[in-house]
């Protein structure tokens, strides 16, 4: 770690979830592309015995793709304020950093930042329409958010929530994985150990249920191709993998995958069925024929927002308990309009970030 950084980033960039890893890396690369020095603030709290920080593929990812000097040590909550001596500004985001129950004791609202520091939010998500903020914490959270000089959020409903609840203005920008350049993604894909030869239907189901299983089997039968089930990135939770394999016993499991295999699995798939937000995002990015199952456990509103802005709500099943078999879902997708919207959203996100670095301090 160096003595000085332009920006310290607080987020879930270190997590074993594939989407979190790619989201955080996109933010790192994007901010650095503006010529800024970046410190990625590691998972706060005590890392002792934390399997996510000792045995996951994410540990290898951080070592491989980040400059080690750009990664902080683990600070306990009561020492995060020491980062003020190293960072001129702080950035929260992206992903569900403002979903209160997973905000690391409110530290994703950057309460440790000193007055006079520039505070930015880069595509932060509340996860749900109200961020699950309890009534007793609402006023305190509002006081933290009003300190930000520039706020962008990932979903339009978050923009409305900030205005209605706190009187705070924000802009909605696209999920950061859409900002990754094609060369970076291609290099990761080429490093994958997973190299499929035959067409396959990819399943990326984070929360398997019997109703999802039965619906998926109908699509597998109709497509007449083998199914591959990509397991969750949290390999330190073997019971989760076991349940996924049992629920999808008609599919070949792809486990112990890193982000390279995750990307390759989506890139090469002939068809995708997923209940993951980032699974949906990469299906769009890679021009897949896909079916997205809204996931209320992880914030169904996020799916509606992303697919609505990119003009692809026709690929969304909103109710995971009612998944129809419809041959229209099997048809190829014309991505011309979706790509136009993605280009527009990318330009907007980059323009917002450029303005945010120049915005007056609150």
Where are these regions (language model features)?
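Active-site anion-handling motifs in enzyme catalytic cores
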Residues: 1-362
